[in-house]
UniProtKB/Swiss-Prot annotation:
Protein name: Chorismate synthase
InterPro entries attached to this UniProt entry: Chorismate_synth, Chorismate_synth_AroC_sf, Chorismate_synthase_CS
Keyword Amino-acid biosynthesis: yes
EC number: 4.2.3.5
Principal EC category: lyase
Alphabetical UniProt keywords: Amino-acid biosynthesis, Aromatic amino acid biosynthesis, FAD, Flavoprotein, FMN, Lyase, NADP
Organism: Magnetococcus marinus (strain ATCC BAA-1437 / JCM 17883 / MC-1)
């Protein structure tokens, strides 16, 4: 199976399945000399960890990461950084009833069709369990960006089903104060009431999220096929359940006029650093970062693993009914926040290394 690696200079590869012995990853290309410990990775892993509220899967995983290589005496050596997370709370028997059935809306059918087999235990490689390793790799990228350029990458859940947060109600300080990663304290009760009904019905729901990257230097991105926005969209779209991504004004651009949409400029601190009046472009023009905040919005679909009976077919092509009894998130968007931050940080770290290597004299 190809496709388990991303990046050009800052390369990340992952391995492992939902119900396997462990998950693992390798980060290759991180410069030598970066102070790094398992605690640096564990902080973001704890934000993603399951079982922290009744609104996420009740699978209990400590997600304790072990660094195996690439770090000596507290600093990166410039060699590949290998790390591993053991799986501790698999309940494969929960999936025995669907081992020959395809869950509607799941990767079961496509994996089976392409490879001639599939790991039905929790979805195997297609499970969001794999993203724990991405979060660990993203923590390395975050620290590199923060120390090298002062870049911050942070995300939030901005909507779920009919509950949508207005931008005027945003407060980044609230994001880490609630288990929804909501930037609006007033929305938490609404999210809880709505999702409780979804959970009790054995159903699931989609969500909207945003990631902002601030402090990104001007010049990241390689036209034309390695545009920064294209690579960011690819990275975010690689997350399980993501079905739509937009940069800046995104789809609303189709309703705008040139007068409305133009990000006008005025003199700044010097000729190379003008001041932008607005940021409809989301911090990227021509595939290259402008120095403004990079703003990415995306939507995740409802998880396909629900208790509501649905019609499907089995591996023999016969009609069947599917009910998924495992432990699942009623809204995968909640834990997608640190995952998306990781994918954005990894992409920015990769482009930062490329930018550093190609800066003009």
């Amino acid at each position: 199976m190809a496709g388990s690696q991303i990046g050009t200079l800052f390369q990340v590869a992952t391995f492992g399945e939902s119900h396997g012995l462990a998950l693992g990853g390798v980060v290759d290309g991180c410069p030598a000399g970066l102070e790094l410990s398992e605690a640096d990775l564990q902080g973001d892993l704890n934000r993603r960890r399951p079982g922290q509220s009744r609104f996420t899967t009740q699978r209990q995983e400590r997600d304790e990461v072990k660094i195996l290589s690439g770090v000596f005496e507290g600093r990166t050596t410039g060699t590949p950084i290998g790390f591993i997370i053991e799986n501790e709370d698999q309940r494969s028997k929960d999936y025995s009833e669907i081992k020959d059935k395809f869950r509607p809306g799941h990767a079961d059918f496509t994996y089976w069709s392409k490879y001639g087999n599939r790991d039905y235990r929790g979805g195997g490689r297609s499970s969001a369990r794999e993203t724990a390793i991405r979060v660990a790799a993203g923590a390395i990228a975050k620290k590199l960006l923060r120390q090298a350029e002062g870049v911050t990458v942070r995300g939030a859940l901005t909507g779920m089903g009919p509950v949508v947060i207005e931008p005027s109600r945003w407060d980044w300080a609230e994001v880490e104060r609630n288990h929804f990663f909501s930037p609006d304290a007033g929305s938490v009760g609404e999210f809880e009431a709505y999702l409780e009904g979804i959970r009790k019905a054995g159903n699931s729901v989609g969500a909207f999220l945003e990631v902002h990257a601030e402090g990104v230097p001007i010049g990241l991105g390689e036209p034309v096929f390695d545009r920064l926005d294209a690579d960011l969209a690819k990275a975010v779209m690689s997350i399980n359940a993501v079905k739509g991504v937009e940069i800046g004004a995104g789809m609303a651009s189709g309703h705008a006029t040139g007068v409305d949409f133009a990000d006008e400029m005025r003199p700044g601190v010097d000729a190379r650093h003008p001041e932008f009046v607005r940021n409809h472009a989301g911090g990227i023009l021509g595939g290259i970062s402008t120095g403004q905040p990079i703003v990415i919005r995306f939507a995740v679909k409802p998880t396909s693993s629900i208790l509501v009976p649905r019609q499907s077919v089995d591996v023999h092509g016969q009609a069947c009914e599917v009910v998924t009894k495992g432990r699942h998130d009623p809204c995968v968007g909640i834990r997608a926040v640190p995952i998306a931050e990781a994918m954005v940080a990894m992409t920015l770290a990769d482009h930062w290394l490329r930018w550093r290597a190609s800066k003009p004299l």
